[in-house]
Structures are given as C-alpha cells and as structure tokens.
Amino acid sequence: MDDTGAAPVVIFGGRSQIGGELARRLAAGATMVLAARNADQLADQAAALRAAGAIAVHTREFDADDLAAHGPLVASLVAEHGPIGTAVLAFGILGDQARAETDAAHAVAIVHTDYVAQVSLLTHLAAAMRTAGRGSLVVFSSVAGIRVRRANYVYGSAKAGLDGFASGLADALHGTGVRLLIARPGFVIGRMTEGMTPAPLSVTPERVAAATARALVNGKRVVWIPWALRPMFVALRLLPRFVWRRMPR
C-alpha cells in the first residue's frame, strides 16, 4: 500500500540533503512534517516542499540523540496529524575515523546517532504503525555496513548493526500492514563527505532520493544505490581478510 498521499509523511532529519530530496519527491498532495534540530530554521526546506505540491508542511523539534523524547514525539505526531503514513529516518553522522580510534567518547557518539538512536526511533514508530495497521518506514543503511572495512570501521559497524536490526524488524512487521524499506547507497557526494575523494560508483543525494522514492512506491524491501553495488559486494565478501584489510575507503 502507498500511504504517502493518505497520511502524513515525516522526515526525521529534515535538514539532511537526502531527506530533503526524498521529501520533495513525496510531497505532492501530502501533509509533510520536517523534524530536526532548530526546527524554526527550516523555512527554506518547508518552502521547497510547498513548491513541490505539499498540501501542508509542519516542522517539529527533533534531537536524534535524545532517546527519551522519541516516544512522546511519535505520540504527539499521531495525535496532531493522525497515523503516520511514511516515516523516513534521514539523520546520521559520519564522524572522524582517526579520532574515533583513540577517543572512545567520539566512537560512542557515532554509534549512538547512527545505530542506537535509529533503533529507538524505529521501535517507537513500528509500534505506532502496528497499532494503526499500516505505514511505511524508510531506513538508510550503507554499503559500508555490508562488510566493514578497516578504513571506516566505526561508522561501518554502526551501519552494519542498523542494517541487521532493520532487516529483522522488516520480518517482524510482515503481515501487519507495515512495511520497511532499507536503502543501501554507496559513497554519497554531499555535505557529509565534502573534501573526501569519491569512491567508485559514487552517487548524489538526488540519485539516492530518486531510487528510494521509486523503491518505496514499488513496494521494494531493499534498494542498492546504484544497483551495481549488489553484485560487487557479493564478490567483495569473498575476498580474503588479508586483502580486505588493505582496501581503501
């Protein structure tokens, strides 16, 4: 079922490039909610969604790392706008791998935002959608989590955990009327990777959003972006470890 026109679409991480691009593609005829820190500064993002055809755009304060606020936020969104049709988890951080290797607090901060906070919010959202008997969840994993590399193992391990959790949650939701889409993009050329040398098969936020929107409409469970990464990682998983540990980012 495509709920995007029938119930609110909520973008958690409404200031992210991928989240913003995906929101524009889901906006036509929909009630949109952008949730992010400093929500009073989302005027430009809200205007873009109105221009894309949203019938209403709301903003909500959201700090992904404030786990205690997740449940009340989801409950208040349902109370104000009705059952959530589509929830997109577009927040996350890359962090500094070199720093994280010696700074435990920084390593934990990366894992907290990219895994723990996602698990918390997904659990609250899944419970609310189960109650409603419908809804769609969109989770952004990464190929960095398919086989974790030495070059970015802190971020990669968080994404590996998220991918596993989301896969299990999708199975748990089977038959409930709630579906979950896992997007697995490769290197994304954007603000978060500014200054870094793009990896092979890199993509833009626009391309990630377009592929994710198509997969959502078509009822897919997983989408690799670009698709060629899927067979590539089938092969990469077979590389001996002594070769794999020398792989660049």
Swiss-Prot record:
Annotated positions binding substrate: 142
Pfam families: adh_short (PF00106)
EC code: 1.-.-.-
Top-level taxonomic group: Bacteria
Residues forming the catalytic site: 155
Binding site for NADP(+): 11-34
Keywords on record: Oxidoreductase
UniProt xrefs under PROSITE patterns: ADH_SHORT
GO molecular function: oxidoreductase activity
SUPFAM superfamilies: NAD(P)-binding Rossmann-fold domains (SSF51735)
Family: Belongs to the short-chain dehydrogenases/reductases (SDR) family.
Descriptive protein name: Uncharacterized oxidoreductase Rv2073c
Lineage: Bacteria, Bacillati, Actinomycetota, Actinomycetes, Mycobacteriales
